[in-house]
Amino acid sequence: MEKVIPVKKNNDYEIYIDDFGNMGEGIGKIDNFTVFVKDAVKGEKVRAKIIKVNKSFAIGKLIDIIEKSQDRTEPVCSIYKKCGGCQLQHLKYTEQLEFKKNKVVECLKRIGKLDLSSVRINETIGMEDPYFYRNKVQLPVGETAGEAKIGFYRERSHEIIEVDKCFIQDDSANEIILLIKRWIKEFNIEGYNEYSGKGTLRHIMIRKAFKTGQIMLVLVTNTENVPHKKELIHMITTEIQGIKGIIQNINNKKTNVILGQREITLWGESTIEDYIGEFKFNISSKSFFQVNPIQTEKLYSAALKYAGLTGKEVVFDAYCGTGTISLFLSQNAKKVYGVEIIPEAIENAKINAKQNGIENTEFIVGKSEEEIPKLIEKGIAPEVVVVDPPRKGCEKSLLHSIAEASPKTIVYVSCDPATLSRDLGILSELGYEVNEVQPVDMFPMTGHVETIVLIKRVDK
């Protein structure tokens, strides 16, 4: 007999919210049928309108809060409910940190099937000030009714929600956006129409080096000719402190990829300089660099602590990117081998090592699951392996190769608790056990959490 679904689309229901979903949405039940309600807080009774019904769950839109949680707070941003950038501004920051810790723990239990009774689970490392933390912002520029618009995409759409002030990006980026809006209005600059492929300005990228204060502005254009660019350069260079370079990136392809291949430096330098800890990095428009440098330093310090290096160890750094973790590890390691599939990232890693005077690192282009077994075949035995994979997690074959190499310590840095938990479940079957788990809030006001895990070989 087919299960009767107790809710109907477009009807309103009173729902008690007894849990949080993956990105912080409220979860309640009607006759044991699950309903997700965005912006509802655990412990609240709400009225929600059902906007979507599936076989096993429904999605409701928050209409009214009948019983309010003491964990609720007023969002600071006027476009919070329209813009897709933040998910948790309505939740007190202490509760955001608790939510993120619980999210990690639930994944470890449910997906990893791990016994956590002897595992140390630390509180989420948060920020003293959880606003204005992003050192990079990318804003689409579109056109509506003949007028250019700058903002963020509405969640799950390409509709641009105009923004004057974003509370999670560095405040100097907000100042630059207002100047660009002034320039667009004054000189009637065309925004890009993604349907017709016409228009001048496609995207604005702003990068700021927090330690040095240097700022880079990138104008992504559909055409090589940018009318009145001299006026914009004058406005930016006279009104923005710390501006180091203004770059034009030309992208005339019909694509969702933001940056094109060709760049022209319109004013100043093509890179900015920043530090993580003691290490200096040159950052171009295309460089990968963690967007929250304050929390990155805490994350990498935890990785170094978990690695427990004494100066005698060989370390493998899988998915090493531009070598930022490798550099941190090199301080206390005998040798660090970094592997990364993106050739440009490896070139950056080599430059970063050279300019910091580091000689005990070696960087290899290739898939970690292919290159690390080759290193092991050459007789290079790691005492410590660090993995920092993309959201999809580690390849199963890589985990098996690591286990066969039998390092005493594995340090796993993850941006997705679900794939982390899956991989930890595999490692637990290969002779390893989880010792300690440290969630880090890299992205306050959002549902995302970074996690670093200390894993030890079980010596029988």
Swiss-Prot record:
Residue ranges constituting the TRAM domain according to the UniProt record: 6-64
Gene3D superfamilies: 2.40.50.1070, Nucleic acid-binding proteins, Vaccinia Virus protein VP39
Residues reported in the UniProt entry to bind S-adenosyl-L-methionine: Q290, Y319, E340, D388
Pfam families: TRAM (PF01938), tRNA_U5-meth_tr (PF05958)
Active site annotation, chain numbering: C415 (nucleophile)
Enzyme category, top tier: transferase
Keyword DNA-binding: no
Listed GO MF terms: 4 iron, 4 sulfur cluster binding; metal ion binding; rRNA (uridine-C5-)-methyltransferase activity
Keywords for this protein: 4Fe-4S, Iron, Iron-sulfur, Metal-binding, Methyltransferase, S-adenosyl-L-methionine, Transferase
Positions contributing to [4Fe-4S] cluster binding: C77, C83, C86, C166
Gene Ontology terms describing biological process: rRNA base methylation
Enzyme Commission (EC) number: 2.1.1.-
Cross-referenced InterPro entries: MeTrfase_TrmA_AS, MeTrfase_TrmA_CS, NA-bd_OB-fold, SAM-dependent_MTases_sf, TRAM_dom, U5_MeTrfase_fam
Family of this protein: Belongs to the class I-like SAM-binding methyltransferase superfamily. RNA M5U methyltransferase family.
Protein name according to UniProt: Uncharacterized RNA methyltransferase CA_C0523
